[in-house]
Regions:
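Single conserved hydrophobic/aromatic residue that forms the stacking wall/gate
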Residues: 1-6, 10, 328-330
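C-terminal segments that line or cap access tunnels to active or ligand-binding sites in enzymes
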Residues: 48-55, 60-303
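Active-site-proximal substrate-binding core of FAD-dependent oxidoreductases
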Residues: 289-326
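Structured loop/turn residues at beta-strand edges in well-structured enzyme cores
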Residues: 13, 27, 46-47, 252
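FAD-binding core/adjacent interface of flavoenzyme oxidoreductases
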Residues: 35-39
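A conserved short coil-to-beta-strand element within the FAD-binding core of flavoproteins
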Residues: 11-28
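Core beta-strand elements of the Rossmann-like FAD/NAD(P) dinucleotide-binding domain
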Residues: 40-49
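Short polybasic amphipathic segments
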Residues: 30-34
């Protein structure tokens, strides 16, 4: 889409820095410092150029394991990444935020996820027993996440409408597992989640599904393929902050640049959603280009009992909230 709109896309290049000229009455992005194949160069900018900066990055340093290998926890912030870029930008003006409020301790911001693919018909009945829906129906399955409240890892899992992918083989399910406490031993697998292979994470999940213990390892080995991912900074945007630790989308006196994404400050909205990032981009474009168009307001549903009740009924497949049933696993 960008190429068809006469855009030039530069691949295999790192943006190392954006340099600014700061005065009392305006702030101007003057150059972009890039490296390619180890060689540094710069792109000079004028006030008529526009620079949109995604500062920080929740998925930076993410690593992928496999069915038989753990995902490595890599916490080193390197040049050319979103955190290092933001640090260099923030050094130039206080209005550009404080990235170290968010990325200073990956032990506080990490968690792990895994994609599990069931390969036959042996695991799906355990999923159906909990969610009360046929996961092969082509309709909503879990309707959200299922959290195992007594899990040492605080494990959660979900299966969305299947098939998840067009090329997904018939008879297979693709689901998502994640754990918020990656540094403590599991209830069944007696090792931290971050040290576990995909198979071992699947074993822990199967244990919480209620699979008989004498079947767990064999099912995890032969009836599923599980790929773990470690994300050291995935919760960075939830770290405590004040009103200036994130830069405004368009800082005061900014002439030709804006910040985008989860680490740019907007009014009323809450991070963690795709909508948040999209709204920052709309604010940036409309402001810098003087577009006379309103950004969609944040819907004030937080304390609206009508929205809360409507969402509850939807999650219950239209059943009234008075018709409560409980599932007990023994």
């Amino acid at each position: 889409a960008l190429s068809s709109a006469a855009s030039d896309v530069y691949k295999r290049q790192k943006v190392e820095n954006v340099k600014f000229e700061i005065s009392d009455y305006k702030k101007v992005a003057k150059s972009i410092i890039i490296t390619k194949d180890g060689e540094e160069s710069s792109i000079d900018l004028t006030e008529n150029d526009l620079v949109f900066i995604t500062n920080g990055g929740c998925v930076e340093n993410s690593s992928m394991g496999s069915q038989n290998t753990p995902a490595v926890m890599n916490t080193e912030i390197k040049a050319g990444g979103g955190w290092d870029l933001w640090r260099k930008i923030a050094e130039q003006d206080s209005s550009f935020g404080n990235p170290d409020k968010f990325c200073y301790d990956p032990e506080l911001t990490n968690w792990m996820s895994a994609t599990v693919t069931t390969l036959d018909d042996r695991i799906p009945p355990y999923v159906q027993k909990i969610c009360k829906r046929d996961p092969f129906s082509g309709k909503v399955v879990t309707g959200g996440i299922v959290t195992v409240k007594d899990s040492n890892w605080l494990l959660s899992w979900t299966f969305n409408r299947q098939p998840q992918f067009r090329s997904q083989p018939k008879g297979q399910l693709v689901g998502w597992i994640y754990g918020l406490f990656s540094n403590v031993p599991g209830n069944y697998v007696k090792k931290p989640m971050r040290d576990c292979t995909g198979k071992e994470i699947c074993m822990e999940w199967l244990y919480h599904l209620g699979v008989p213990e004498n079947q767990i390892e064999e099912l995890a080995e032969n009836s599923a393929n599980t790929i773990p991912v470690m994300m050291p900074y995935i919760d960075a945007f939830f770290m405590p902050r004040n009103g200036t630790d994130r830069p405004k989308v368009v800082p005061n006196q900014a002439v030709n640049f804006a910040f985008l994404g989860q680490f740019a400050e907007t009014e009323r909205d809450t991070i963690f959603t795709t909508e948040y990032s999209i709204r920052t981009a709309m604010v940036a474009v409309y402001t810098l280009l003087n577009v006379d168009r309103g950004v969609p307001e944040v819907w004030g549903s937080t304390y609206d009992i009508r929205d809360l009740l409507n969402a509850t009924v939807k999650l219950r497949d239209g059943k009234p909230i008075t018709a409560v049933s409980y599932t007990h696993l023994t």
